[in-house]
Design a protein with these regions (language model features):
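Catalytic cores of the polymerase beta-like nucleotidyltransferase superfamily
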Residues: 1-492
């Protein structure tokens, strides 16, 4: 998509471009002057390049986010200078500069302690591996550089004097809240298949829709994603999941997600044949993800968001039909944790995240009641399974179970009320203090040996674990005097 009247640049000089922009300011997509508040360090970087005789623009994510009223994105600059010329200009200005991507014309200048990527105008060669250009060609015109970019909202350039350069109606698409590929979508996705996940990521992060032709190309080009390294897929998928709009991603681009995470594909149209469920497994999963966001006011932890997506991942594999004709999924939480562990490892996500997600998946069907004993057992199981803080995960597990209940058939949603009572009990118990491991009891091994006249050895640990079991069962509180009194009763 190119807007009429936008590519009329008779000169590659800054003066020529400024004249061109003024001539074509009536274009619907070449914006009239806008005033964005550029940080002083970015202004300094532009000044250094321009004083050396080169042209420079701020591009990409900072421009996109600034037009939306957000200024959190890192600054990227594109310039007519070669990387060697950029480096020389910054060094002459006593600004530290590093060769961070010279094959692609990129150096990083550290201006007022802020890193700024500075890249030569370029166009990309063929993408023979569907991941990165086989070669790049450095060019003198910014139009050629903007033409290689992925989406219109990322293909705008800004200069404090020349204003906004918008050749592909990016500002219009921002206002319309739509993700739109630059040029022919199939070409963009064939060049770099990871752009399909980027389209979903931006749509989820910004709560945008996807333009019709771009959306159609997502479906048609989805198989190309299998050529991309798993860790690169993992990086993009993690940002989609952790943006908190997973249901939106499932709706917009499930064919792409199903290539990125093949384990999701069997969930689609899988009839659960259960009175507890009104939806197939994929629709139920999407509804659990949405309910999770609603219950946490959009502040769910990464582990909870992943667990919401993966909690029923093993249901198709564990499906069986009872004599009553109903569907059953015995063992699917435990099997789901195994599947999730392998999946997260393949995507190169952290072991800590994997441990927490797998614990939540494994225990998402754990039967709880509103008693201290049930709560303590749940926390201890979470702490053991996740190798981390079972109390923090207990909040996530209760939220996951609530979301799961709310995504079931209407008659079975009342369990969410019980879980809310469990949450209140959890808050009460946290104030009192909860032991998650035997080592957190208020008696030491030395005190156990003294009370029972034991010598150092395995028997001490056995007694400590027995005390912990009594504590979990609610038969004793974690107070030193109470625990010593239990030890004094004998029968150890």
């Amino acid at each position: 998509m190119t807007c009429e009247g936008c590519i009329l640049f008779p000169s590659a000089t800054a003066e020529g471009m400024a004249m061109s922009i003024q001539k074509n300011s009536s274009s619907p997509c070449l914006s009239r002057p806008v005033n964005l508040q550029i940080p002083t360090y970015a202004l300094r970087a532009l000044e250094v390049l321009e004083d050396a005789g080169f042209e420079a623009w701020i591009v990409g994510g900072w421009v996109r986010d600034a037009l939306r009223g957000s200024f959190a994105h890192d600054i990227d600059i594109t310039t007519s200078a070669t990387w060697q010329q950029s480096k020389a200009a910054f060094e002459a200005a006593d600004i530290p500069v590093h060769e961070t991507g010279i094959a692609y014309g990129t150096v990083t200048a550290v201006v007022e302690k802020h890193p700024i990527e500075v890249t030569t105008y370029r166009c990309d060669g063929e993408y023979l591996d569907g991941r990165r250009p086989d070669s790049v060609q450095f060019v003198s015109r910014i139009e050629e550089d903007l033409a290689r970019r992925d989406f219109t909202i990322n293909a705008m350039a800004y200069h404090p004097k020349r204003g906004l350069l918008d050749l592909y109606c990016g500002q219009e698409d921002l206002s319309a809240r739509v993700i739109h590929a630059v040029g022919e979508p199939k070409v963009r996705f064939t060049e770099d298949a990871l752009r399909m996940l980027r389209a979903l990521r931006f749509a989820c992060r910004l709560s945008f829709s996807i333009e019709e032709k771009t959306h159609q190309a997502l479906t048609e080009c989805a198989p190309l994603l299998s050529q991309v390294a798993s860790e690169r897929i993992g990086s993009e998928v993690a940002q989609i999941v952790e943006a908190g709009h997973i249901a939106h991603a499932i709706k917009l681009g499930f064919p792409v997600l199903a290539i990125a995470i093949p384990e999701l594909l069997p969930l689609q149209n899988f009839d659960q044949r259960s009175p507890y469920h009104a939806y197939d497994v994929l629709e139920h999963t999407a509804r659990v993800c949405s309910a999770t966001e609603a219950l946490t006011a959009g502040c769910a932890t990464p582990a909870l968001r992943w667990a919401a997506l993966l909690h029923d991942i093993a249901k198709p594999e564990m499906f069986s039909v009872g004599v009553d004709g109903r569907g059953h999924f015995y063992g699917h939480p435990e099997k789901g944790a195994i599947v999730a562990k392998a999946l997260l490892k393949r995507l190169a996500l952290s072991q800590h995240l994997s441990n927490e997600v797998c614990a939540l998946v494994a225990l998402h069907d754990y039967d709880v009641d509103v008693t201290t004993a049930s709560l303590r057992h749940m926390i201890a199981l979470l702490a053991e399974a996740s190798k981390s803080d079972g109390i923090a995960l207990a909040y996530d597990l209760l939220t996951l179970k609530q979301a799961d209940a709310l995504a079931k058939a209407n008659p079975y949603r009342s369990y969410a009320v019980t879980l809310e009572a469990m949450r209140a009990l959890l808050l009460h118990e946290v104030k009192r203090g909860i032991a998650q491991h035997p080592q957190e009891l208020c008696v030491s091994g030395a005190e156990i040996m003294e009370a029972l006249s034991l010598q150092p050895g395995p028997a001490v640990g056995v007694c400590q674990r027995r005390l912990f079991e009594l504590y979990l069962a609610g038969q004793v509180e974690n107070r030193r005097e109470d625990l010593l009194a239990i030890l004094a009763q004998g029968n150890w």
